[in-house]
Amino acid sequence: MAIVGAGPAGYFSAQALQSFSSEKTTFKVDLFEKLPTPWGLVRSGVAPDHPKIKSVSKVFEKISDDPNFRLFANVEVGQDLSLEELKSNYDAVVLAVGTPSGKKLGIPGENLANCWSSAEFVSWYNGHPEYSKLNIDLSGKRAVVIGAGNVAMDVARLLAMNSSNLENTDISDYALDELKKSQIKNVWLCARRTAEFASFTAPELRELPELEDTSVIISSKEIEGAMDRLHSDAGRHVRANLEAMHAIACLSHREKNKTLEFHFGVVPKEIRGNGKVESVLFDSGQGEIVVEADLVVTAIGYEIDSEWGLRVEGNHFENSDGLIEDNLYVVGWAKRGPTGVIGTNKSDSAEVIKRLFLDLTKKDPKQVQGIHKLLENLSPINLSEWRRINEFEVANGMKSNRPRVKLMTTKEMVDVAKGQS
């Protein structure tokens, strides 16, 4: 089996395949990843001040210990290898490629300097090698974050918090340096819909009052109005969200160094500026408002990469319960769209792999030579080489009381992996 994409959906697919192995049937799993490092958004998407979420990486490493598991990192399917070449060399191919691009608002001004998608901004502060050179300018006074989910909250929280709270995390060194120099004092978190439709989760909201250097401001009138508008069948998570926001709204505020303000029901119409972000025009439902801004981050979701040449439906590859076409399957966000938490991918992958297993029981295994000839001109990073990177980063982190100090460039990663550093 070939799995493309070494994020949670890819690893959980490998785990599901391993669970179907028996004395009669053995699944050999090759996991391909375009970066030199696996783990996907667990490495490059989870906020650095949320280390508990990253602990799922221990599960991934246990999955990797299976003798029939191989990692081929630093190999980009679609560039280094074609999808057709994989399909010719494996009994089945599973795409676990996620939805890597930030969704666009589709309004004027999105291409101005210092307007970023959350996909870019989060990858930047998490040390993704493809985003390490972004020229993110934190020298202004106000940042506007547009979105109403946990990613938007992560971005707003990191911009509003005291950077000293990030010193013992695995945030990228360059992002930590920039946040230490940041002049941003006011962060607006702007949601297009009213508070009852926000996709935050209550635990993340409850963390916000712990920001000792930051006043968190939510209108109690807005939250009480949202509570009044709730239908009787509203889910528990919605009520928990509103209760958490109401608790914040009721806090007394002493003057602090920074403010994080929630604004609901404000629809962005235009990002304005002369070559660079200067303000954002919103429709508040009662008229237009112009908010001065020096940085804009849009966090309204992610989009599928259509360069695979596969049909896209909505925001995922067209599929029938995970089957795209004969011997080609899809899991995770690429299957269902960018929804759910890390654990959602486990059940999702298990369902698709069960179907794959049943499909393969009706066929004879392919007699192929393997992919080594296809890889002979490439420089794949295998499991032991990835673990060399991992050990190097963790060892460097121990010197400064951090979980790890990430290598920032593909070259650095390859050099360490190959023992050339």
Positions of predicted regions on the chain:
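Glycine/Thr-rich phosphate-binding loops of Rossmann-like dinucleotide-binding domains
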Residues: 103-104, 125, 197, 306-307, ...
